[in-house]
Amino acid sequence: MDKTILGSIDIETLIRHLMIIIFGLVGLTGNAIVFWLLGFHLHRNAFLVYILNLALADFFYLLCHIINSIMFLLKVPSPNIILDHCFYTIMIVLYITGLSMLSAISTERCLSVLCPIWYRCHRPEHTSTAMCAVIWVMSLLISILNGYFCNFSSPKYVNNSVCQASDIFIRTYPIFLFVLLCLSTLALLARLFSGAGKRKFTRLFVTIMLAILVFLLCGLPLGFFWFLSPWIEDRFIVLDYRLFFASVVLTVVNSCANPIIYFFVGSFRHRLKQQTLKMFLQRALQDTPETPENMVEMSRSKAEP
């Protein structure tokens, strides 16, 4: 029997929820800073619009998990099951939105490298803003329809064909986004490392690659769990429980990691003295190879308000 603390909460469950709260608070702070700087202090280009929306999705995703863990540890009862389903639906929306934003960033970066002339001359000006709006609407629509047909409907309608179709779609959609993310990333890497198109890496490229790598390690397991859960839960009940909560903790780590990546890439090979968070973020999202001239220009920007 597992050792318990705080009444009936076992040590493993306590540690898991404490990890979610600790990582979540770090991520909340980091994503709030990123959103504040990108929203009010930096000029936004095509990629920064996606990163701004990614920070917003990560912020609210972490906030939902922190609230859920605190309520669990304090044993605060939920008012009713409808609110539980709504809360769960919101977290699905935010998870799918984050994955969609990352896939859009990778795809747009791939297009900017593979088709540079078209990208600079013929790409509509507000494509990034429009794509972000589409992503939010799609994520909301998919999650709300699934919640309506499978959770909010009368029990006698829960197992109907519409619910099953919706359930299959929401399980396979993250896998589709994962395939799109991988294909665009592989195409980008192939072009950058090929002899004809070989070019210097920018800090923005490094930032995107690190964010994708962290997502593949920490964010994607939950998507695979959703996809495989119909086969897992019927055969391995204990394994199903442990895999689910392990994947949830990993998604919290993933949402917490992006601001750390930005400030790590932005501060790499630069002295921390007299540097601001704005300068770190601006440097991490810089899309031009570093030269002595633009390094001097970046150092001068610290004098700006």
Swiss-Prot record:
It is found in: Cell membrane. Pfam families: 7tm_1 (PF00001). Keywords: Cell membrane, G-protein coupled receptor, Glycoprotein, Membrane, Receptor, Transducer, Transmembrane, Transmembrane helix. GO terms for cellular component: plasma membrane. Orphan receptor. May be a receptor for RFamide-family neuropeptides such as NPFF and NPAF, which are analgesic in vivo. May regulate nociceptor function and/or development, including the sensation or modulation of pain. PANTHER family: MAS-RELATED G-PROTEIN COUPLED RECEPTOR, MAS-RELATED GPR, MEMBER A2A-RELATED. This is Mas-related G-protein coupled receptor member A8. It comes from Mus musculus (Mouse).
